[in-house]
Regions:
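A short, basic/flexible loop-to-alpha-helix module at the beginning of a structural domain
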Residues: 1-12
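Fold-independent oxyanion-binding glycine-rich loops
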Residues: 20, 42-44, 55, 62-63
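Glycine-rich FAD pyrophosphate-binding loop
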Residues: 32-54
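Structural recognition of the beta-strand scaffold that forms the well-ordered cores
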Residues: 40-42, 52-53, 59, 95, ...
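Surface-exposed patches in mature extracellular/periplasmic domains of secreted proteins
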Residues: 43, 75-86, 103-114
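Conserved redox-cofactor binding core of oxidoreductases
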Residues: 89-142
């Protein structure tokens, strides 16, 4: 028998983002900034998603063409080129994007040289972008 303890939820949103890791957070910000009413949900009490496994680092690329070559090799032609190209181009723009986002709270964004895992063409274009510090942020409070 169905329970009568259901919660009434009648709010409406243009976009519902499921998962509050880097990708979900950025998707929610972009949708909001374009004028959408956004709901961001996550199954965990604290945000971060799988992003916490990367110690807060985002894989970045100095050169989108070199990143494309590397990523195409590593995926063994299982992913369409336009998807691989979009990923490579996004990786080449993530550091300036994060610097812009960090302006709101004075977060310190730092690049760290860290080549890709395998010595294929383009591996040396990769590095990491990290958020080193967020002034007056106490993670223990969350």
């Amino acid at each position: 028998m169905a329970s009568d303890n259901s919660v009434k939820f009648d709010d409406e949103y243009d976009i519902v983002v499921v998962g509050y890791g880097y990708a979900g957070g950025i998707a929610a910000i972009e949708a909001h900034d374009l004028g959408a009413k956004v709901l961001l949900v996550d199954k965990m009490a604290n945000p971060g998603g799988i992003s916490v496994c990367s110690y807060g680092a985002m894989r970045s690329a100095h050169n989108a063409d070199e990143a494309f070559k590397y990523l195409k090799t590593t995926n063994g032609d299982r992913t369409p080129d336009d998807v691989v190209r979009a990923l490579a181009e996004g990786m080449s723009r993530i550091e300036p994007y994060m610097r812009k986002l960090a302006e709101v709270n004075g977060a310190v964004v730092s690049p760290r040289e860290k080549v890709a895992n395998y010595p294929f063409d383009g591996y040396d274009t990769f590095y990491q972008t990290l958020i080193e510090e967020v002034p007056n942020f106490d993670p223990a409070a969350y």
